[in-house]
Amino acid sequence: MNSRSFIIMVERIFLSVLFVSVSCLAKGQQTPLSPVSSWVFTPYVYNPAMVGSKDFFSIGLNAAFQGNSNAQLISGDTRISKTGSGYFSSPEVSEFKNIGIGGSVFKDISGISKNIGISASFSYHVPLNVSHLSFLSFGISVKGIYNSLDNDLVGPAHSFKKTLYPDFDLGVYYYGTSFFTGLSSTNILGNPWKSDTLKIFKIPVSRQYFFTAGYKILLSKPMNIVLEPSALIFVNDSTIRKISDNINPIIKLYIEDFSFGTSFYSDGKISFFAQYRYPRIWVGVFYELPEKTAYFSKSPIVEFTLGLNLQPVKSKISNHGHW
């Protein structure tokens, strides 16, 4: 089998999986304020230092539903650039500045709680060599979140005032041609002090801490095949003393415009994900098996994502670097 036939076969398999996953979308769910698949498709949501780390403007949409719970997230990021003059007959070229910007609009309904929010992210990228192939970046996200409780579900005795509260995230991120690592914290202000009149229900927000590290291994240059082993550690204030129980190893494989992978969790869960890039458009699917249950006795998590990469038209070889 030649390389072209192999790539066509992979594309057909991905489209088949995508069709099945979309039909299951109505059974999906997301973690409030932190979509389950964001660490795969839009990692800058949990680490603002990643904003602008790619050389194109990207917009992503995540959506999932399950019963009375649902969540939607629209996010985007870009690196600020300026137009510079080319050489001789060459056209003008874009030169990237050190500043990245991004933002998101999100809504999630989980049980009796409903959150609607907006965020703005800023990052500063410091080049670590003259070739500008490795950077150390610092980022911050400022958020405004509007929270309310469904009084029809909690009853009139638990009268709850609708609350608009601020929050922010911080992050630091190193990335080069092969190795990357980052550390971030979200919802730093924690849970707002307001609650219902009987002090029973509180706004479901907690500080979250993320650490990620990974390495890209080139397996085949002619076929643009890259293997990326990595790990993600995610804890909050209540689990920060159990870091060893929250290490999630991740394996990801890139084959030209297609990527897929899997992640393993210490609590027995396992997830699969895949992404395919069309010119300027990318689609992806995320599927997580339930925790230690046999044959879907609990609903699995299924998410679908759609995005736009609004980068200048480049050669095919160059575009394969846009992951």
Show which residues each predicted segment covers.
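Subset of outer-membrane beta-barrel
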Residues: 29-323
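Cleavable N-terminal export/targeting peptides
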Residues: 1-32, 309-323
